């Protein structure tokens, strides 16, 4: 995997390590992907990618050729009209290993526990009036709830 920092591709900087820049039209979403990406999530992710560039590549299995991580990032790239996305091609020992990674990729993040006080401090530090708070991933109602809860 190579590091190609700050390389612009169709309007989004690439800051993550990746093997290649693939055409979005050549990438194949995994037919067994259980995660759905609602329009609101895709729009928010697109806004973050447009502002910050790519911080994580789309992961493609060398075994099947399907995406195993990054379906939402691909949807955001399509929404932005990007032609190419950074891709990390990975080997999987078996179909079962590939499917387990597909399932675990998002599930592991869901199992994290949030320290509300630290989150509040972090969000208050960002909220200077000069920063677009949408880029934190929280909408105005969620921000208010977090700040008032801790």
Where are these regions (language model features)?
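Short, charged/polar connector segments at secondary-structure boundaries
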Residues: 1-150
């Amino acid at each position: 995997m190579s590091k190609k920092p700050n390389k612009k591709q169709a309007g989004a900087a690439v800051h993550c390590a990746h093997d290649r820049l693939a055409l979005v039209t050549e990438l194949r979403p995994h037919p067994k992907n259980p995660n759905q990406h609602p329009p609101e999530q895709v729009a928010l992710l697109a806004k973050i990618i447009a502002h910050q560039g790519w911080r994580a590549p789309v992961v493609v299995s060398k075994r099947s050729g399907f995406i195993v991580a990054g379906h939402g990032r691909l949807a955001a790239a399509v929404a932005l009209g990007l032609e190419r996305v950074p891709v990390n091609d990975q080997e999987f020992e078996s179909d079962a290993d590939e499917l387990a990674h597909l399932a675990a990729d998002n599930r592991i993040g869901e199992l994290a526990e949030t320290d509300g006080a630290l989150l509040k401090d972090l969000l208050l530090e960002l909220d200077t009036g000069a920063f677009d708070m949408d880029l934190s991933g929280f909408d105005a109602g969620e921000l208010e709830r977090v700040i008032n809860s801790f």
